[in-house]
Swiss-Prot record:
Binding positions for a divalent metal cation per the UniProt entry: 468, 473
UniProt subunit comment: Interacts with sigma-54.
This protein's record includes keyword Nucleotide-binding: yes
Domain (GAF): residue spans on this chain: 40-187
MF GO annotations: ATP binding; ATP hydrolysis activity; DNA-binding transcription factor activity; metal ion binding; sequence-specific DNA binding
Organism: Rhodobacter capsulatus
Protein name: Nif-specific regulatory protein
Compositional bias ranges of the Pro residues kind: 505-520
Length: 579
């Protein structure tokens, strides 16, 4: 062994090596942090090159990937990132990375170092900007995260001899190889997240499809689910078709029971977001605190009981439609928070500081008079103008009489399918239903059909079996009575129910009786009784005769409830006569 070989490194050399090692560790630490926080690791490569330049004097970084990844693909790389080079995005990779170098790394799968590109490959094989005699190059392979034996790309960096350091050392090769390894791990992690997300979305789509198939027509999601051909409903459908393709917020207005969610789903189904999620929130069903957590989500530990992170409805509806039902019921304090999301498309989870951006279309619905609420200071004017970009007024059922029969048939078919029955409506039953006003709109019509089908004695429902023919239709009485002198089911009604939304609809007319009752003969005034015990058999019979043997009418004459009349009939063993 010579003296030169046995001679230990000088303190100055050891100090220089220690500084270089520390700089390399600092660079790797910064790069690892950048990749860990990056949603797209490839997009952070220019920043990585800046770190390498600052800490290790590695200039002119290049990341090139295969244009056609695969085992049999040729070497035809395209540049993803290149720093310190003035080049257009369409320029070939050979402008910043010699083809010969790319072929060597892609085919061998090992790092490549050149201390003089021109001397090694010839001037014609090296881009003009890289022909300086002092230009050196290091290139390491970037492997496919799923197939480690397959080279996906090349990570390269240049250094000029005219800098303080010349050429490359083994340490430089190791550092750049570790950077490539960090990039591979980040790509593998992001691919795994993307696969898991796609799998979760596919599971969600599959479950939604299963639920939709099980519900059948109960949850229509397109214009095909809207039943009716009346001019009023045709105008609404035309408006939905016109506005669905835009990004504008839609405000559905109308009385309770007019089917706002059905029309909101129709807007979603006709829009470019049809394949995205449709998320519904009933704003009236939640308190202000719960509504904030439900819409925005919350971080783990944000409040007592928040044992895990929960995404809000805005996040779940990203790329789709969020249906805010009963938006007129939210508190003034929460309106300002909602306004910010609608204006800027961003929010923070409850208990969190990270701002989340979403792309969600808003469809809101209300049966309140929002203009009056704004005038009274109960609803923010700026929020009103934000949600009321495209208002669509849904007509009440009494304004679309021709749609009642097909709707009733739809509900009857649904009842038969759900209960394995074959109940049908007689023609006079359909006629009777079509004469009703239905202040509860489509929801009340559905209840009416289901009640009649469930209580029917036979396979055909007759007109006299309907509640309105028996004087037991509460909603019909609510519309007929003008004062509160007559109790209905024990409740005094003070006024006629009117729509809460201002629409150009004529006042409802009382449903005419199918058969005019014979004029009652003069009789003595029946004294009011409030207790069944005070009622005599004769008084009850006299009231029934005057009322044409209709229990509800007899109850009103006696100032009693139908239940009390039924109890009195049982007590006195009186059978109702059919007239």
């Amino acid at each position: 062994m010579t003296d030169q070989q046995s001679r230990p490194a000088s303190p100055r050399r050891r100090s220089t090596q220690s500084i270089a090692d520390r700089l390399a560790l600092d660079a790797l630490y910064e790069i690892a942090k950048t990749f860990a926080a990056a949603p797209d690791p490839v997009a952070e490569v220019p920043q990585i090159f800046n770190v390498l330049s600052s800490f290790l004097d590695l200039r002119h970084g290049v990341l090139a990937l295969l244009a056609e990844p695969g085992e049999g693909a040729g070497v035809n790389p395209y540049v993803i990132a290149a720093t310190a080079f003035q080049r257009s995005p369409e320029a070939p990779a050979a402008d910043v990375l010699p083809d010969a170098v790319a072929r060597i790394v892609f085919r061998s799968g090992v790092p490549f170092v050149s201390f003089d590109l021109v001397a090694e490959f010839g001037a014609e094989a090296v881009p003009k900007r890289l022909r300086d005699a002092g230009q050196t190059l290091i290139a390491v392979p970037l492997r496919d995260p799923e197939r480690s034996h397959f080279v996906l790309g090349v990570l390269a960096a240049y250094r000029s001899h005219d800098h303080n350091r010349s050429g490359f050392s083994d340490a430089d090769v190791r550092v750049l190889t570790m950077v490539a390894s960090l990039l591979e791990q980040a790509l593998r992690f992001r691919r795994r997240i993307a696969r898991d997300r796609e799998r979760a979305l596919e599971d969600t789509r599959r479950m939604l499809q299963t639920v939709t198939e099980q519900r059948g027509p109960a949850a229509p999601v397109s214009l095909d689910g809207i039943v009716g051909s009346s001019p009023a409903i045709a105008e609404v459908v035309a408006q939905i078709k016109r506005v669905a393709s835009t990004r504008m917020p839609v405000l559905l207005r109308g009385e309770s029971g007019t089917g706002k969610e059905l029309f909101a789903r129709a807007v979603h189904a006709q829009s470019p977001r049809a394949k995205g999620p449709f998320i519904r929130v009933n704003c009236a069903a939640l308190s202000e605190t719960l509504l904030e957590s439900e819409l925005f989500g919350h971080e783990k530990g944000a409040f007592t009981g928040a044992t895990a992170l929960k995404k809000g409805r805005f996040e779940l509806a990203d790329g789709g439609t969020l249906f805010l039902d009963e938006i007129g019921e939210i508190s003034p304090a929460f309106q300002s928070k909602l306004l910010r999301v609608l204006q800027e498309g961003e929010f923070e989870r409850v208990g969190g500081a990270k701002t989340i951006k979403v792309d969600t279309r808003i469809v809101a619905a209300t049966n309140r008079d929002l203009e009056d609420a704004v005038a009274r200071g109960q609803f923010r004017a700026d929020l009103y103008f934000r949600i009321c970009v495209v208002p669509i007024v849904l007509p009440p059922l009494r304004n679309r009489k021709s749609d009642i029969k097909p709707l009733a048939q739809l509900f009857l078919d649904r009842f038969n399918k759900q209960n394995a029955t074959n109940v049908k409506f007689a023609a006079d039953a359909f006629d009777q239903i079509c004469r009703c006003q239905f202040p509860g709109n489509v929801r009340e019509l559905e209840n009416c059909v289901n009640r009649a089908a469930a209580l029917s004695d036979g396979a055909i429902v007759l007109a006299e079996e309907l509640a309105c023919r028996q004087g037991a239709c509460l909603s019909a009485e609510l519309f007929r009575l003008q004062d509160g002198t007559s109790p209905i089911g024990g409740l005094a009604v003070g006024r006629v129910i009117t729509p809460t939304v201002r629409v150009s609809a004529p006042p409802p007319e009382p449903a005419p009786a199918p058969e005019p009752a014979p004029e009652a003969p003069p009789r003595e005034e029946v004294p009011l009784r409030t207790k069944t015990a005070q009622l005599s058999r004769e008084e009850l019979l006299r009231a029934l005769e005057s009322a044409g043997w209709v229990q509800a009418k007899a109850a009103r004459l006696l100032g009693m409830t139908p239940r009390q009349i039924a109890y009195a009939l049982q007590k006195f063993e009186i059978e109702l006569r059919k007239i």
